[in-house]
């Protein structure tokens, strides 16, 4: 671990401002950006981690707000449809060894300890393949953080469709994610010096 990674940082707790704390760790949503191909989003994330810009205000993004508004419904629908119970809702966790890796879990599936991720997608851009591809970095990151072997992606679409997608941990892909995240965080911390 580098000196930059080992530096003392605020702890995640319920009373802390999560927007401020997000600067000090890489989360699942960050993994999706880091492993994606949206260069402006990647540059913005890098600048956020450096403290140059505030996290983007998504309160005016209707699709994001629909996702937030349907998370509880999504979880209840998943539980009713599968008979499974989701625990650890909105639990903030850190990787036990790589303290710069964190996750805010939508939940864990009781009994299997699978990571549960609830998403809302617009019907005209939805396919199971597209959903799995879009959210795979986030699922793999979150599975790595909590040492889970599986994840469940529960998707509600604006067209009234619900889909469950099961993902298995992919150690090779997780290694690539950790490497890319580490490089992103190191560059944000060290270039400032």
Regions found by a protein language model. Give the residues of each.
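Nucleic-acid nuclease catalytic cores
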Residues: 64, 80-188
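Long, amphipathic alpha-helical segments that form or neighbor coiled-coils/leucine zippers used
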Residues: 192-193
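Charged, glycine-rich intrinsically disordered N-terminal tails and low-complexity linkers that flank
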Residues: 1-69, 73
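A carbohydrate-recognition surface predominantly in extracellular/luminal proteins
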Residues: 74, 78
């Amino acid at each position: 671990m580098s000196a930059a990674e080992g530096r003392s940082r605020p702890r995640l707790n319920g009373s802390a401002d999560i927007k401020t704390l997000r600067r000090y760790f890489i989360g699942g949503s960050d993994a999706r950006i880091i492993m994606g191909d949206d260069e402006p989003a990647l540059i913005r994330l890098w600048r956020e981690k450096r403290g140059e810009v505030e996290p983007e205000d998504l309160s005016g993004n209707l699709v994001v707000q629909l996702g937030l508004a349907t998370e509880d419904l999504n979880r209840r629908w998943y539980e009713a449809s599968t008979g499974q119970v989701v625990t650890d809702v909105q639990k903030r966790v850190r990787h036990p060894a790589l303290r710069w890796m964190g996750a805010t879990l939508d939940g864990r599936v009781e009994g299997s300890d699978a990571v549960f991720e609830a998403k809302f997608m617009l019907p005209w851009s939805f396919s199971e393949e597209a959903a799995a591809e879009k959210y795979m970095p986030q699922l793999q990151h979150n599975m790595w953080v909590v040492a889970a072997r599986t994840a469940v992606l529960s998707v509600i679409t604006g067209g009234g469709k619900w889909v469950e997608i099961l993902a298995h941990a992919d150690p090779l892909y997780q290694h690539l994610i950790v490497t890319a995240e580490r490089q992103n965080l190191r560059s944000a911390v060290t270039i400032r010096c």
